[in-house]
Every structure is written in structure tokens, then in C-alpha cells.
């Protein structure tokens, strides 16, 4: 389920007065700034899929994720490499709240085998577990998102979050060399 542009987003917001793409320290601002963040669709999409197709209890589905976030998971070699990729370090280092998640309190990277505990994520997942999508798009989680956005010149507002609706789209189909190809229709990412 796709993210949506915030209501304050405009067609030309990434262009300077000469119509050229604005860059920041990391790269084009359209890819690497808080203004590029769309209103997340995953939570609403998962709830829609569960309502349409699910047979298990919602809270039971979310419970293992809450537990893993709170108790932690071991850092794998892949996660260690991902967190220490120079590009990602630039992204994660932009905001103290990101650094707090992806690096130890000392600022050092997590090493393979270290336990990665995400208490804040556990709290967010618990709100979703107890309240469905409203646990994300309203209440404390929505307040935390919009507070961060406001403090860091982002665009997402409480109205953006509360207006988000997941859209079920019909997949596109075609055949190629005796194979049926099924993919996401536009707009999609990697579809």
C-alpha cells in the first residue's frame, strides 16, 4: 500500500527559482530530506487486508512483533553492514532520534551478535495491536510523528495522517513466453 503525498506538498517544492533540483549535503533534496517523506500506508493497508482476507485475531498477529521489538533481536552481519553503509550512516545521522535507534548510546555501531532492542517501536506496535490503524494514524503515535515533522520542517500533519485511506488496486497482468506476469499497477514502487 502506497504512501501518499502530504497535503502541503507541491509540484515544484524541490525546484529552485531557476527550475533546477535543489540539493542538500546528502544529495537531491527530493530523495534525501524530510520533505520527501510520504504519509505511510502500510498500517492501513495491513488492516484492510486483514479485514478482507484475515482469519486470525489482529492482536494475536501483532503480538510477536511487539515482543521482538521489546526483547530485541540479534544484529546479523547483514544488519551491521547496512547500518554502517556510508550512505545510510548519513541518513541515520541526520536526526538524534534516528541515531538513537540505529547506534548504541555511545554512538558506536551495533556489532554482529549484539541485541538490538527497540522499545519505542514496541510501544507503537502495541498501540496498533490494541487500536488497529487508529493506533497509528491517531493518538500518541500520530502526535509523535507530527511533532517530529513540525520540529524538523517536515510536511506531514495530523490531518494528513487522519485522512489516509488504503486503496485496494487491481493487479496488472500480462503474459510473456508462456508465463503469466502479475504486478502492481501504477502508482507502485518496484512494480
Where would I find each of the regions flagged by the language model?
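Noncatalytic scaffold domains of N-terminal-nucleophile
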Residues: 1-132, 136-138, 142-188
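Glycine-rich and small/hydrophobic secondary-structure elements
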Residues: 191
Amino acid at each position: 500500500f502506497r504512501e501518499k503525498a502530504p497535503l502541503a506538498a507541491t509540484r515544484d517544492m524541490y525546484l529552485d527559482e531557476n527550475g533546477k533540483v535543489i540539493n542538500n549535503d546528502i544529495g537531491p533534496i527530493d530523495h534525501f530530506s524530510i520533505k520527501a517523506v510520504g504519509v505511510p500506508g502500510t498500517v492501513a493497508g495491513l488492516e484492510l487486508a486483514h479485514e478482507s482476507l484475515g482469519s486470525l485475531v489482529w492482536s494475536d498477529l501483532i503480538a510477536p512483533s511487539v515482543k521482538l521489538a521489546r526483547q530485541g533481536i540479534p544484529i546479523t552481519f547483514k544488519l551491521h553492514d547496512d547500518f554502517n553503509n556510508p550512505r545510510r550512516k548519513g541518513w541515520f545521522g541526520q536526526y538524534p532520534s534516528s541515531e538513537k535507534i540505529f547506534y548504541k548510546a555511545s554512538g558506536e555501531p551495533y556489532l554482529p551478535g549484539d541485541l538490538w532492542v527497540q522499545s519505542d517501536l514496541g510501544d507503537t506496535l502495541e498501540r496498533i495491536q490494541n487500536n488497529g490503524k487508529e493506533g497509528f494514524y491517531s493518538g500518541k503515535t500520530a502526535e509523535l510523528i507530527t511533532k517530529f515533522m513540525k520540529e524538523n520542517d517536515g510536511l506531514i500533519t495530523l490531518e494528513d495522517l487522519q485522512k489516509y485511506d488504503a486503496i485496494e488496486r487491481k493487479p496488472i497482468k500480462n503474459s510473456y513466453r508462456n508465463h503469466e506476469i502479475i504486478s502492481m499497477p501504477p502508482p507502485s514502487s518496484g512494480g
